[in-house]
């Protein structure tokens, strides 16, 4: 799907995720709905990074309070994006990835080395003391395996359509660059076995750990030299700052272009930049307040936010690959999914143990297809559809040169 996103961004000149769907369907209502979903996703996502950064600061010996640490982090993130913009974070992400990969692999190897019996010893102890955290019970299957596998599928689809994903794709130089990155992406899975081993090692060696989110830092602090702990902390801190910076910049652009701009008859470049900067700063401030004042409430909000963001997947799939998609159909489907998420999570209703977001997305897709089949694309939608599919049909060398 990533090359299709890049093609649409190239043709339409889109700068944000809602821009794509405004261009494709010419619907301001759809644009605003997608923008609201993006903002609801990005705010708790930023708050989660602040919480992670606060955990890192506790392990590097900074004698500052949780609140002060988060405030300093917000100031650094704002200065960072004000100076560097979006492309510099894309470059620095390479350094972040190298540091994080090295840290996770090192942590996993240390866990294997320090446990008698290595990997088998770690899992033998985990099964003996925490069997419920190692094995998924077969019965009742609707409350265990069905939920786990539907959640895996749902999250995998959601990763394709987050607003951050669109932002990173738009900054790529060409469609070939996107394809090369997709070839490399599976290599990131290399670190997960080491991360799992490290997590279970901490589970069996530090059973009374108060904050499970700090398990990896606890492992490195207890088993690695100080300079290595510093490297791990640097990788984690850089990751948090990078995500905060890109998220805030993305949120500012979405608000100024796809919400504030929609309700203004004319917007100058100077006004748009001012609103973007103000919104970026406000989003950092709101995330800091949420991280400090309402950390427990945000756990539920993060869940709903991800459920909402993933509701964009059926619409995106239809937008890029189905000529018969109509503005009425995709809007009806997306709205159905958003409402279904709220109803299912608030009432705690489940169907066969499936992930509630997955159920909502299924309803979303069914409504979208049904309405699209009952309606016809208008002339403007047909024009954008023809332009998109004509561009995709070009020969590879020509497409790469554009």
Region annotations inferred by a language model:
Residues 1-402:
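Membrane-embedded helix-loop-helix hairpins and adjacent transmembrane boundary segments
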């Amino acid at each position: 799907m990533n090359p299709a996103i890049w093609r649409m961004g190239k043709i339409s000149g889109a700068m944000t995720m809602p821009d794509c769907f405004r261009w494709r369907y010419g619907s301001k209502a759809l644009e605003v709905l997608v923008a609201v979903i993006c903002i609801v996703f990005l705010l708790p996502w930023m708050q989660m990074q602040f919480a992670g950064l606060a955990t890192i600061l506790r392990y590097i010996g900074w004698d500052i309070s949780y609140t002060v640490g988060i405030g300093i982090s917000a100031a650094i993130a704002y200065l960072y994006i004000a100076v560097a913009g979006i492309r510099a974070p894309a470059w620095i992400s390479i350094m972040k990835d190298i540091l994080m990969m090295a840290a996770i692999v090192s942590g996993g190897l240390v866990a294997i080395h320090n446990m008698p019996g290595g990997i088998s010893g770690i899992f033998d102890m985990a099964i003996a003391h925490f069997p419920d955290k190692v094995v998924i019970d077969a019965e009742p299957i609707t409350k265990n395996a069905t939920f786990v596998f539907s959640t895996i599928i749902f999250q995998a689809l959601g990763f394709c359509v987050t607003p951050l994903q669109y932002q990173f794709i738009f900054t790529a130089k060409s469609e070939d660059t996107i394809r090369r990155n997709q070839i490399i992406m599976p290599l990131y899975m290399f670190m997960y076995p080491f991360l799992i081993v490290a997590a279970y090692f901490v589970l069996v060696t530090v059973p009374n750990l108060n904050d499970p989110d700090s398990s990896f830092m606890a492992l490195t602090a207890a088993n690695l030299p100080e300079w290595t702990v510093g490297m791990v902390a640097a990788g984690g801190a850089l990751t948090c700052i990078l995500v905060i910076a890109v998220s805030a910049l993305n949120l500012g652009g979405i608000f100024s272009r796809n919400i504030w701009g929609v309700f203004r008859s004319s917007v100058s470049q100077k006004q748009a930049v001012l609103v973007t900067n103000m919104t970026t700063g406000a989003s950092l401030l709101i995330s800091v307040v949420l991280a400090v004042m309402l950390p427990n409430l945000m756990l539920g909000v993060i869940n709903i936010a991800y459920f909402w963001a993933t509701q964009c997947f059926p619409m995106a799939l239809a937008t890029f690959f189905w000529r018969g998609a109509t503005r009425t159909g995709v809007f009806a489907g997306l709205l159905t999914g958003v409402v279904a998420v709220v109803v299912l999570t608030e009432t705690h209703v489940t169907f066969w143990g499936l992930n509630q977001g997955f159920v909502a997305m299924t309803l979303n897709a069914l409504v979208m297809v049904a309405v699209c089949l009952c309606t016809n694309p208008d002339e403007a939608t047909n024009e954008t559809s023809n332009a998109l599919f004509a561009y995709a049909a070009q020969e590879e060398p020509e497409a790469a040169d554009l």
